[in-house]
């Protein structure tokens, strides 16, 4: 192997190790709770944290259970959004949680980083509003009368605190490296796009006050959207993600569209550096599990259909017995009683 090839291989290895480690904090999702463990046991022994995250943990121990919930939210939402895709957001019980897929600069990695940073911002914000954290509470900057004539009142979600904590905790590895590498720039951009997905979908919730349900006075507050809505928004951004490449702009490096004919991406868009594998066949070196054995939809022409999901390999069909509730009746008072029925269904799995 030539010296140039050796250097390139070494760079790729460092790139992969750095990229995987940047998302290792997601291993917190595998824990049942971090809130009941003392500081000494918690922060030093939590798997997947780099030293600066350990220090943040020590300074913000009460917030760490929200970070864990945010990681869980992110993984669950990723698996929901990709449940019918060739890559279905499978996780491992080791580091990195999503396997080697996140070590590559693909659009799948872009989604993982975006939904993860959004998960932390969301969970910390909700913890602030629910009174779980001493360091933050409701957003008191939202007050007075709105231009629409309603009174700002109640507990507005403190999204500013949630976003700031997510930036400090999730972005720390990339920022500690100076954010100069292509992958660091990609990760930071997608982290911010995830948080933007919450900010752009913040909503106003209101309550009417008056005699007999009239709305003489209406009080309103700002609330984060349901996390499912955030997941849908980021999935749309995934489908329209922009392939980029690093370029020096002035004295700094920036990511620009690889195809000059494409319009520049915005802060809310996802970006990626390299095309994705097809995820058809198992390749443990790149962390691809393949689609063999996956359940498919025989009648669908979409990606969940047997033709596309099974990558043209065909599929097996089996008759399976499904247990389900049936003949349900309401009994006074107050419960529903059902029978357990067996139903034969066809199950199709990829060859």
Curated annotation (Swiss-Prot):
Keywords: Developmental protein, Disease variant, Disulfide bond, Extracellular matrix, Glycoprotein, Lipoprotein, Secreted, Signal, Wnt signaling pathway. Residues 1-22 form the signal peptide. It is found in: Secreted, Extracellular space, Extracellular matrix. Changing residue 114 to V: In SERKAL; reduced transcript levels. Pfam families: wnt. Ligand for members of the frizzled family of seven transmembrane receptors. Plays an important role in the embryonic development of the urogenital tract and the lung. Required for normal mesenchyme to epithelium transition during embryonic kidney development. Required for the formation of early epithelial renal vesicles during kidney development. Required for normal formation of the Mullerian duct in females, and normal levels of oocytes in the ovaries. Required for normal down-regulation of 3 beta-hydroxysteroid dehydrogenase in the ovary. This is Protein Wnt-4. The lineage of its organism: Eukaryota, Metazoa, Chordata, Craniata, Vertebrata. The gene is WNT4.
């Amino acid at each position: 192997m030539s010296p140039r090839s050796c250097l390139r291989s070494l760079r790729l290895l460092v790139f992969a190790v750095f990229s995987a480690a940047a998302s290792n904090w997601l291993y917190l999702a595998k824990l049942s709770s971090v809130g009941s463990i003392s500081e000494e046991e918690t922060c030093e022994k939590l798997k997947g944290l780099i030293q600066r995250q350990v220090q943040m943990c020590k300074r913000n121990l009460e917030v760490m259970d929200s970070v864990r919930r945010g990681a869980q939210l992110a993984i669950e939402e990723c698996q929901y959004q990709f449940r019918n895709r060739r890559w279905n957001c499978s996780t491992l019980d080791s580091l990195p949680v999503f396997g080697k897929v996140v070590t590559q600069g693909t659009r799948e990695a872009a989604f993982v980083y975006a939904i993860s940073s959004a998960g932390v911002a969301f969970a910390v914000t909700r913890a602030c509003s629910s009174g779980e954290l001493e360091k933050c509470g409701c957003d008191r900057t939202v007050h007075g009368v709105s231009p629409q004539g309603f009174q700002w009142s109640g507990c507005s979600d403190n999204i500013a605190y949630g976003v700031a904590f997510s930036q400090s905790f999730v972005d720390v590895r990339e920022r500690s490296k100076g954010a100069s590498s292509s992958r660091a720039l990609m990760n930071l951009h997608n982290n911010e796009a995830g948080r933007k997905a919450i900010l752009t979908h913040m909503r106003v919730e209101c309550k009417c006050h008056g005699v007999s349900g009239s709305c003489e006075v209406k009080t309103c507050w700002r609330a984060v959207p349901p996390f499912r809505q955030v997941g849908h928004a980021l999935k749309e951004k995934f489908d329209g993600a922009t392939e980029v490449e690093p370029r020096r702009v002035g004295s700094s490096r920036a990511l620009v569209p690889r195809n000059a004919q494409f319009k520049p991406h915005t802060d809310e868009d996802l970006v990626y550096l390299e095309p994705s594998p097809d995820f058809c066949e198992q390749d443990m070196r790149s962390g691809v599990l393949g689609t063999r054995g996956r359940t498919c939809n025989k009648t669908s022409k979409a990606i969940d259909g047997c033709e596309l999901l099974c990558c043209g390999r065909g599929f097996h069909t089996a008759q399976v017995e499904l247990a389900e509730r049936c003949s349900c009746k309401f009994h006074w008072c107050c419960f529903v009683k059902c029978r357990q029925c067996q139903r034969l269904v066809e199950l199709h799995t990829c060859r």
